[in-house]
């Protein structure tokens, strides 16, 4: 009887979770992105993340006529601002914002440019500077991952749009 209750509980929990539309993040269907060229510096975190996410990608320095799509990272701007202050007037929370300016060069010669923005916040604690620095690093990493994901989705939609024409 106890085993039956456990099975019913697990079954009902899985039905509730699947019915609310919950699904795991992180996977992107990249079947149309077999070969992608990335124009950017190897020191650029976004370029490195793109190489990790797109297994058939290559990093190039100069853009030439290619039969593969090219992602060109034009510029990344980072800004940091105070979100809140405590009663003594010191910063309690910071927000980091990054804007990625990119250019997509598709195999048919079409060029698309755009901007992507992502931000994250973290708590600031003066007495724990090492932990605060780590929080800032984690926030920067999450912003870079979000921008990379958005850029891949933009490339995928641009490729689908040119294939449908």
Task: Give names to the regions the model predicted.
Residues 1-8:
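Bacterial N-terminal signal peptides that target proteins for export
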Residues 16-19:
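C-terminal motif of bacterial Sec signal peptides marking the signal peptidase cleavage site
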Residues 21-23:
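Bacterial signal peptide processing site
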Residues 29-77:
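N-terminal segment of the mature soluble domain
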Residues 56, 70-115, 121-137, 153:
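Surface-exposed short loop/turn segments
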Residues 130-165:
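C-terminal/domain-edge helix-coil "capping" segments
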